[in-house]
Amino acid sequence: MQRRWGWLAMVMATLVALLGGSARAGEGVLEMRIYTCEPGKLEALNERFRNHTMKLFEKHGMKNIAYWEASEGPTAGNTLYYIIHHASREAAKKSWADFQADPEWKAVAKASEEKYGKILAKPPKAIYMTEADYSPASEKAYLDKSYELRIYTTALDKLPGLHSLLKEDGEKLFKSHGMRSSGYWTPTDEPKSGNTLIHIVEHPSREAAKESWKKLDADRRWIDAKAKAEANGKLLAVSPDTVYLKTVDYSPKP
């Protein structure tokens, strides 16, 4: 009987994660997709997602987690970023095939391109990801917050060291300076799986983000933790690739 209840508890925990406001990659696979639009076509893409695409994703077993646009920098005004959840990598493959073959999707895509012309400047970039063991559950995004996508590329064999730094010191120090992590993910496919960490940070505002990073960089606890972690060499091969994001109006509500 005890074993039976343990099994039921595990099933219920999985359902809560998948049906509620968050999803763990351990219960499936997460996919980040980045769409680059032709000049002036981002709102056409947003219209298609808002009115049709998200519903069709759910129809084919893909769970919408969060959607953003870049709020500044070279990708502002032409790029959509989003995260979806799949039951498994095989399920993802089937879902995308079924979605692409769906007559409803074909009609939507045809109608939007007849109305607006070519919308995407290039094929979408897809990154399948797994959560780090210290990551919060991937969750929906708030409209009134500022988000920051940070992509870290480590030096050779330094990804475990970066994980340790963030797990043991970084995360608690981020919180102490008003920054809240939405998730830490590692790509599942080589070569990125061995040297890349994807991190999204939630800030109360863009100005708050600037102030928080300034305070963190001056914090002796962070300076010492980083120096200790890099005693045998730099962790990062290059500076983090950073994009500030704003949540779009059709992103699932928390």
Regions found by a protein language model. Name each.
Residues 1-4:
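N-terminal secretory signal peptides that target proteins for export/translocation
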Residues 6-10, 106:
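Hydrophobic alpha-helical segments and their boundary regions
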Residues 9-18:
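Bacterial N-terminal signal peptides
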Residues 18-224, 230-254:
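Short S/T/G/P-rich N-terminal loop/turn motif that feeds into the first structured element of a domain
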